[in-house]
From Swiss-Prot:
Gene: RAN-A1
PANTHER family in UniProt: GTP-BINDING NUCLEAR PROTEIN RAN-A1, RAN GTPASE
Domain Small GTPase Ran-type residues, every copy: 10-174
InterPro entries (UniProt xref): P-loop_NTPase, Ran_GTPase, Small_GTP-bd, Small_GTPase
Source species of the chain: Nicotiana tabacum (Common tobacco)
Protein name, as recorded: GTP-binding nuclear protein Ran-A1
């Protein structure tokens, strides 16, 4: 039986909830996938837009029904109806705004209260912007909660597919699953400084080998 906002399809489909503070780029991220943007449906009872995002894997086609909050989070927490039946999730923060990272634990708690034991990806968005405030070494929450973390840039399409590939592998129980063709994405609006971002990725890898902070508060220099 299809869930609200989902038509029945004859290939695997999953409800993906995307959460995070307002302005972190969740809608921009989802809208990069042109087919999903064209076929989106608005669910007025819950106040969300549902974008069907198709990906083609070596095991066949899969679909993520991406639930986008349409900005509701700016007026307080999200209703449980947004989370119910969620099968996977992305928590997004903005690397240029520290508060959005500090609020990640709250989003994670709200998500896990309704959706138990689902695969979750933490995404640090806007890595194309020069004045980064959340440094790679300061991102430790994913290690504490055993989440996958990716640095992304929605406007440049940098790492767009990685969260979806990780979730697809987890949901399929197949670590060798891979995408056999790229989805149609909107053209990049900005260019990312790849050399600078590779340096951030190296710092992230180095930080992963360091002991975790003792307290729950993320430290900012």
């Amino acid at each position: 039986m299809a869930l609200p906002g989902q038509q029945a399809v004859d290939y695997p489909s999953f409800k993906l909830v995307i959460v995070g503070d307002g302005g972190t780029g969740k809608t921009t991220f989802v809208k990069r996938h042109l087919t999903g943007e064209f076929e989106k449906k608005y669910e007025p009872t819950i106040g969300v837009e549902v974008h069907p995002l198709d990906f083609f894997t070596n095991c066949g086609k899969i679909r993520f029904y991406c639930w986008d909050t349409a900005g509701q989070e700016k007026f307080g927490g999200l209703r449980d109806g947004y989370y119910i039946h969620g099968q996977c999730a992305i928590i997004m923060f903005d690397v240029t705004a520290r508060l959005t990272y500090k609020n990640v634990p709250t989003w994670h708690r709200d998500l896990c209260r309704v959706c138990e034991n689902i695969p979750i990806v933490l995404c640090g968005n806007k890595v194309d912007v020069k004045n980064r405030q959340v440094k790679a070494k300061q991102v430790t929450f994913h290690r504490k909660k055993n989440l996958q973390y990716y640095e992304i840039s929605a406007k440049s399409n940098y790492n767009f597919e990685k969260p979806f590939l990780y979730l697809a592998r987890k949901l399929a129980g197949d670590p060798n699953l891979h995408f056999v063709e790229s989805p149609a994405l909107a053209p990049p609006e900005v260019q990312i400084d790849l050399a600078a971002q590779q340096q951030h990725e190296a710092e992230l890898a180095a930080a992963a080998s360091q002991p975790l902070p003792d307290d729950d508060d993320e430290t900012f220099d």
